[in-house]
Amino acid sequence: MFIRLLLPVVAILLFLIEPVFALFSPVEMFDRIIYLVPRFLFMYLLFLAVYYDRKKSIIYGVIFGLLYDVFYIDIIGLYAVLYPLSCIFISKIVKYIQQSLAIVTILTVFFVALLELVIYEFFFLISFTSIGMEDFLLSRLVPTIFANLLFLILLGWIFKYFIKTRKLQSV
């Protein structure tokens, strides 16, 4: 019973922890202000799509995407569409490649970068942001990728362990 509740509880905790880590941003380094955007929940959803169940990761993606839209950005539908789409794409990709932790980590970081780019382009398109692409790349995208990669290196194996444990329990 405990393992059954573990997957949604971890997702809820990650959803609640992200804004706490966002408080550490912006940071001034190398005469530049950098922004670190935690994407812990998004990475967890991608791990669910790869190691557990694509359908459940899509459902979690829609639910938490809507919650993210409502509580953090006030534009309904952006994350509610991007989270499940990313889960679908990564689950399709891993059918053709090895599902080792290193490969999934690289793919997850790639999807974090892609998510950040799509969100930036959307906000730029609706004039919600005015920073240029170069500033975005240097002050937000690259630091966000490194920060989330560090998080995955530290906790990715724990994600995989919990998800695999739940999968074995359901068999």
Each model region followed by its residue ranges:
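Terminal, non-globular segments
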Residues: 1-171
